[in-house]
Amino acid sequence: MEQQTAYSLKQSIIFSHKFAQLSKALWKSVEKDWQTWIKPFNLNINEHHILWITYHLDGASISDIAKFGVMHVSTAFNFSKKLEERGLLTFSKREHDKRNTYVDLTEQGRELFLETLEAYKPSTYSVYGGALPIKDLYGKFPEFSELLSIVRHVYGPDFIDMFETALTRLEDGFIEEDGKLKAVDSETKSTV
């Protein structure tokens, strides 16, 4: 006897279509806003994302960048190479891992990344603006627990761990000062 599926084909296609359509709509807005944000720094989204990941991982392998940046390994490598040519990243091998290629931010790369964060303006981000009515109504931004669960099942717990680590580092490693996000230096961290 055939085992019945718990979910119908119709439910599956409706869910998948809703998710695809809403994700595409949100991504279109995020992509436009992200490109506008980083354009003055002569960066594209992949390059900025690589700087972001490398900053939060304090150096990263090309494989990690591909995994956490949700991009093909060749994309991660090629855009990292462009960043290296601009003096923003360096390539190296680790003593404990000669197989993988690692990238680290140069001081210039770190400074540029931090400049991009200082230049962020919430009023220019449509998705953020779209969430404000929810915050006004409920006193907090939407939670992402269901979405995180889906992503965890698709990409695995390592992806979510890195995501949460980056958020914690952003929360703990930056302060708002004069309407801008600034990195907390090691002296400030020890007194906070």
From Swiss-Prot:
The record places domain HTH marR-type at 12-156
The record's annotation in InterPro entries points to: HTH_MarR-typ (IPR000835), HTH_tscrpt_reg_Hpr (IPR023488), MarR/SlyA-like (IPR039422), Tscrpt_reg_MarR-type_CS (IPR023187), WH-like_DNA-bd_sf (IPR036388), WH_DNA-bd_sf (IPR036390)
Q: Has UniProt tagged this entry with the keyword Transcription regulation?
A: yes
Which residues fall under the DNA-binding region feature? 62-85
What Gene3D superfamilies does the record point to? Winged helix-like DNA-binding domain superfamily/Winged helix DNA-binding domain
Q: Which GO terms describe its molecular function?
A: DNA binding; DNA-binding transcription factor activity
Coiled-coil region(s): none
User: Which BP terms from GO are recorded?
Assistant: negative regulation of DNA-templated transcription; response to stress; sporulation resulting in formation of a cellular spore
Q: Name one Pfam family in it.
A: MarR
The domain of life is Bacteria
Q: Which UniProt keywords apply?
A: DNA-binding, Repressor, Sporulation, Transcription, Transcription regulation
PROSITE patterns, sorted = HTH_MARR_1, HTH_MARR_2
Subunit composition? Answer: Homodimer.
Q: What does this protein do?
A: Negative regulator of protease production and sporulation.
| Name this protein carries in UniProt | HTH-type transcriptional regulator Hpr
Q: Name its species.
A: Halalkalibacterium halodurans (strain ATCC BAA-125 / DSM 18197 / FERM 7344 / JCM 9153 / C-125)
